[in-house]
Amino acid sequence: MSESLHALARQLEQAIRASQPFQQLKQAYEDVRRDETAYQMFANFRDIQLRLHEKQMRGAAILPDEIEQAQKAMALAQQNAKLARLMALEQQMSMTIAEVQQIAMKPLEELHRSLMEEK
């Protein structure tokens, strides 16, 4: 049974890869990769984001100046048309995947709800 679920998951992966939103996102990444300025801004923003995430995962405090640095990098990145497009497309794709995840989790949620309703 789990093999069939994995097969369906692989089909979903292929459907995502073939979808227009994913293809647009892929093109946006390529556009950023080809633009040195946009690429450097993206790399800087991503580095800051990763450092903050690592600190958060370790339970370390994120300092106000680190938050400010991240906000400035984000604001700067959003001023670049290619990066702004990439971020918007990435957000749309994330929302779509979150919706798919909600659908996939529905059976578990129904089980939890039914358990609570029985008592």
From Swiss-Prot:
Name any one Pfam family assigned in the record: Com_YlbF
Provide the coiled-coil residue spans. none
Superkingdom, taxonomy of origin: Bacteria
Question: Which HAMAP family would you find in this protein's record?
Answer: UPF0342
- Would you identify the family this protein belongs to, as annotated? Belongs to the UPF0342 family.
Official protein name in the record: UPF0342 protein GTNG_0551
Which organism is the protein's source?
A: Geobacillus thermodenitrificans (strain NG80-2)
Q: What is the lineage of its organism?
A: Bacteria, Bacillati, Bacillota, Bacilli, Bacillales
